[in-house]
Amino acid sequence: VVDGFGRTLAFHRAAKGDVAGAVTGVTDGAGRRFHLALTTQAQRAEAFRKQRASSLSSPASPRSVSSSQVFPDTLPAGTEYGADNGIRLEAVWLTHDPAYPDEQPTAPLARYTYTAGGELRAVYDRSGTQVRGFAYDAEHAGRMVAHHYAGRPESRYRYDDTG
């Protein structure tokens, strides 16, 4: 892709695996390469189960299981716009910068977390600081009810009966 200023963006797609066909890399006009780390709903569910099992083995952790601790292997069926394949962007990594070839970051430029329903929960910067947060209606999948930027007041949304 070439923009109006003559700068190019080249997109790279996964050839195989759980995210085959998805864009997993970008090279910009300056020659910088970025890796887009993608996850599937099943991978996020497995990570959740491992984290939960680890925390349950700790003597200090609570033993009760709430409905918020359920993380399904697949997303709920049916969205208004078609099936959701469950693939989500987990992190963006700078993997090559010609201006600094020996100084690549040891952390992602951005990291993203999701709810059990696949909705974006939080965005983190390269220092690991949460910079955005989102909340959703428990009874209406995907309906955002609040969001906030770090250090700023939360914005909340209310919906009438028609949505």
Say what each PLM segment does:
Residues V1-G163:
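Extended charged/polar low-complexity repeat regions
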